[in-house]
């Protein structure tokens, strides 16, 4: 072995099966994680080849565990042996990434307009949805209704959550410090389920907390 550093070592080994190179510098190296192996096979026909989500951002450099880089503690998904894939930890941003299109600025502007008019992202595709409904059998119509209901309910929860975490007018708490960690975790998990149900992706990783944390 190479001494202490079990938390970082375990996290980086979890999906790669590789012993990471012990460093807190830039020369990090672990292995390709199994989710990315699957993503290359299963992700060609979906909007997202894979999703990497979590509830804590974590640093990508520096000494986080007895000489091991923070990149080892904060990531379980590795695209190459030297390239960890950072997690999306903000449920609102993940929702918009899944269900909106356009540049980041266009997505943010669309969010502001929808919230101002109290509209859902599904309102933007209502006509297409009605056309699709007519083409489906009763069972498929029921499934589609169930999916749309899930999206609407989750959107409402996200709006409520974003209002609750405001500390000052126009200022939100940092996304790595949610007001209610349990609800934050449930929102991310539900978004992952919707992504699977909508066949937006077939591969996802969910890292609830960074290695060595007491979550």
Which role fits each region the language model picked out?
Residues 1-215:
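Ligand-binding pockets and gating/stacking loops
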């Amino acid at each position: 072995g190479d001494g202490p550093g079990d938390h970082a070592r375990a996290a980086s080994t979890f999906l790669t099966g590789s012993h990471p190179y012990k460093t807190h510098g830039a020369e990090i190296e672990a292995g390709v994680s199994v989710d990315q192996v699957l993503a290359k096979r299963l992700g060609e026909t979906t909007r997202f080849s894979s999703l990497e989500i979590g509830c804590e951002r974590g640093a990508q450099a520096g000494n986080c565990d007895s000489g091991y880089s923070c990149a080892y503690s904060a990531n379980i998904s590795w695209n190459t042996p030297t390239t960890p894939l950072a997690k999306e930890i903000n449920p609102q941003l993940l929702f918009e990434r899944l269900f909106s299109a356009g540049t980041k600025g266009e997505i943010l502007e669309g969010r502001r307009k929808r919230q101002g008019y109290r509209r859902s992202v599904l309102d933007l595709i209502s006509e297409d949805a009605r056309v699709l409904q007519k083409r489906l059998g009763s069972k498929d119509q029921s499934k589609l209704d169930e999916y749309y209901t899930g999206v609407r309910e989750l959107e409402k929860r996200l709006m409520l959550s974003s209002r609750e975490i405001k500390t000052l007018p126009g200022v939100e708490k940092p996304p790595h410090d949610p007001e209610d960690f349990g609800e934050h975790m449930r929102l991310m998990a539900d978004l992952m389920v919707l992504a699977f149900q909508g066949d937006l992706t077939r591969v996802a990783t969910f890292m609830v907390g960074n290695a060595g944390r007491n979550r």
